[in-house]
Structure formats: structure tokens, C-alpha cells
UniProtKB/Swiss-Prot annotation:
Mg(2+) binds at residues 16, 32. The gene is aroL. Binds 1 Mg(2+) ion per subunit. This is Shikimate kinase 2. Keywords: Amino-acid biosynthesis, Aromatic amino acid biosynthesis, ATP-binding, Cytoplasm, Kinase, Magnesium, Metal-binding, Nucleotide-binding, Transferase. Pathway: Metabolic intermediate biosynthesis; chorismate biosynthesis; chorismate from D-erythrose 4-phosphate and phosphoenolpyruvate: step 5/7. One of its GO terms (molecular function) is shikimate kinase activity. Residues 112-126 are annotated as: LID domain. ATP binds at residues 12-17, 120. It catalyses: shikimate + ATP = 3-phosphoshikimate + ADP + H(+). Disulfide bonds: none annotated. It comes from Salmonella dublin (strain CT_02021853).
Length: 181
């Protein structure tokens, strides 16, 4: 059994898209902390935040992280999962953490194109480009501190997956076949 692979990064960096492709390429299971949380509490992230505040959401997010963490699993995390010290230490100790890094312009373009964007609560109440810039400035150091590997997420998903697989230690590269040749 292999350690879980945790994908971290801001909204729009491709954690879910890359995570599903990486799981397929490695034969690992795929889990998404936000989706797990929403399916278990039957509320959107925005509804959880409205009813319980960010503190309540962050506590539930930690529970989701622990629930989906299992060997041979690719875990797409919420963008703010690194805000909790426990989560950073847990992921770094239990698995391999990969920071999907992308510039503000890429993140904004992707978020504007997402149909689910309205389901996410604003973090600052500011226009999207300003919010993304501010949030990334606040969190980038935490993503980097937590990550074992930093991967450029501006490329096509297949290329990002290939780069992740190439970066991983051989013991983690248990593939069912080279999907992206």
C-alpha cells in the first residue's frame, strides 16, 4: 500500500481535475474533501459557512481530511485546508503533499469559467481577481511549507499528471500503465 497523495493549492489550480486524472494514471482511489464534506452534511460549502461560520467549516474540513485519508488514495483538498496547523502537519506526516502552483491570472480565468463558482462563498467580499491575489499572497507560503513537491499547474492536465508522477519517489509510482504517453 502506498501513502495518500494530497493535492493542495488555491481555488482554480486544478486539484479535482488533476486528482481524478492522477488517480486513474496510478490506479489509486480518488477523494475530494469538499465533495465528501458536502455529501455527508447535505449542504454546500457556502451553506455550512453561513450556518456554522468559517470556524465550523474548518473543523468539518479536518474531519473530512481524516475520513478520506487512506493508502493509495489521491486526495483533492479544499484551498484553505492548509490554514489549520494540524492539517498541514497531518498531511505532511501521513502522505505526500503536492502543491499545484499557478499564477493569479490562470486561477481567475479558471474560476470565471467554472459553473460551480457561485456555490463557493467569497473569502473577502472583493472582486474575484483581487480576492484571488490577496488569498494567494496569504496562503502561498503555507502551501510551499506543507508540500513535498511543487508542480506548475498551468499546463494541460495530462502534462501536470506526468510531471507529478516523474517527481514522486519510485516506491510511489506504482502505475497500472503509462496512460499519458
Amino acid at each position: 500500500m502506498m501513502q495518500p497523495l494530497y493535492l493542495v493549492g488555491p481555488r482554480g489550480c486544478g486539484k479535482t481535475t488533476i486528482g481524478m486524472a492522477l488517480a486513474q494514471a496510478t490506479g489509486f482511489r480518488f477523494a475530494d474533501t469538499d465533495r465528501w464534506l458536502q455529501s455527508h452534511v447535505q449542504m454546500s460549502v457556502a451553506d455550512i459557512v453561513e450556518k456554522e461560520g468559517w470556524g465550523g467549516f474548518r473543523a468539518r474540513e479536518t474531519a473530512a481530511l481524516e475520513a478520506v485519508s487512506a493508502p493509495s488514495t489521491v486526495v483533492a483538498t479544499g484551498g484553505g485546508i492548509i490554514l489549520t496547523d494540524y492539517n498541514r502537519r497531518y498531511m505532511h506526516r501521513v502522505g505526500v503533499v503536492i502543491y499545484l502552483c499557478a499564477p493569479v491570472s490562470t486561477l481567475v480565468n479558471r474560476l470565471e469559467a467554472e459553473p460551480e463558482a457561485d456555490l463557493r462563498p467569497t473569502l473577502t467580499g472583493k472582486p474575484l481577481s483581487e480576492e484571488v491575489r490577496e488569498v494567494l499572497e496569504q496562503r502561498d507560503a503555507l502551501y510551499r511549507e506543507t508540500a513535498h513537491y511543487i508542480i506548475d499547474a498551468t499546463k494541460a492536465p495530462a502534462q501536470v499528471v506526468s510531471e507529478i508522477i516523474a517527481a514522486l519517489p519510485p516506491s510511489t509510482q506504482r502505475l497500472q500503465g503509462d496512460v499519458y504517453t
